[in-house]
Amino acid sequence: MDFALTPDQEAVREGVVALCSGFDDAYWHGCDKAHEFPHAFHKAIAEAGYLGICIPEEYGGSGLGIHDAAIMMEAISGSGAGMTGASAIHMNIFGLNPVVVFGTEEQKARFLPPLVRGEEKACFGVTEPTTGLDTTRLKTRAVRKGDKYIVDGQKVWISTAQVADRILLLARTTPLDQVSKPTEGLSLFYTKLDRDRARVVEIDKMGRAGVDSNEIFFEGYEVPAEDRIGEEGKGFRYILHGMNPERVLIGAEAIGLGRAALARAAGYAKERVVFGRPIGQNQGVQHPLAADWMALEAAWLMVQNAAWRYDQDLDCAAQANAGKYLAAEAGLKACQNAIMTHGGFGYAREYHVERYMREAMIPWIAPVSPNLILCHIAERVLGLPKSY
């Protein structure tokens, strides 16, 4: 067992840290305040070749694994970019895995290089307002008519849909009452997102204002049949290939954010003098921060375990879910304690930790709630009866 990073992983981390040093907290504060997508950051990441970290080399990528990507995303978030920086590229890192695995050679050649070069941005169109995590009950329909599909329905919580050029869209092509089991009859498409034909409405939310979240309304939206990924009706199985990597990356991002908050808290505790001594000399300040460090380190080990298992083609569902759970809990707690360490100043935007905490809610809630992760572990690992 070797816990050391490989030379390639060290190079990835060092390169990303160096790149992110050009985007300080003032930059991310500005994106958040102006509700402005970090285009300059996205461009820099693309030009450095990091958008294609997991894309096969024959399509312009680096052909590295999810473990490498997790190291990159932790470094991005930990630079102070938080979920704004991570979410700006998150979908591009893991989201097209179904295209890589199940797409035709023509589709891969058409779709992947523009994404790697940063010429196109993608969003993930699965969640719906009335189904939540019950993906098999999606109501968005795609009906085949000749060489195209006609899509009608609604999606919600679709990140980057204000700037995305394409959408990975899951829709029902066979009605639920006509399939033998609910997981059948869903089809996956990777197609252009035309905001002149689909209505995209931004959601005003708590944090990460620099990366938009949206509702999308499709009405008679035409999708070329050549944009369907794999077989009709098999989309649910295809989309599963992206779920464990997403949990790994979300976990890595939560850890980076928690570490950024912890670093600011420790720095402030050393400098802030009250009653003639640094507040960091008090155990009441020290101990929560020390506990945060331990929790973040432990969660990072679980996230890396899940990433390694995925890259080795081993089952990693339990580890990916556990890693996401532990990382989100540790990251959120570190952000809360960073605010408490700063006292009243922690509530002020200029100290940045309040932005970190608002963003830390994202990996805690999404893409799967901590409650359902506990249900998954109870059922799939411990063999307990399904509770829902």
Stretches found by the model and what they are:
Residues 147-148, 152-199:
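A short core secondary-structure module
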Residues 92-102:
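Helix-loop "lid/cap" segments that line or gate small-molecule binding pockets
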Residues 1-80, 89, 102-107, 114-119, ...:
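Alpha-helical interface subdomain recognition
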Residues 118-126, 170:
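A short, Trp-centered hydrophobic/proline-enriched beta-strand micro-motif
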Residues 49, 72-77, 171-173, 191-196, ...:
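Short Ser/Thr-interspersed hydrophobic loop/turn segments at strand-loop and sheet-helix junctions
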Residues 137, 194-222:
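Flexible, small-/acidic-enriched active-site or ligand-binding loops
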Residues 220-238:
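Long, acidic (Asp/Glu-rich), low-complexity accessory segments flanking structured domains
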Residues 129-139:
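Active-site-adjacent elements of ketosynthase-type condensing enzymes
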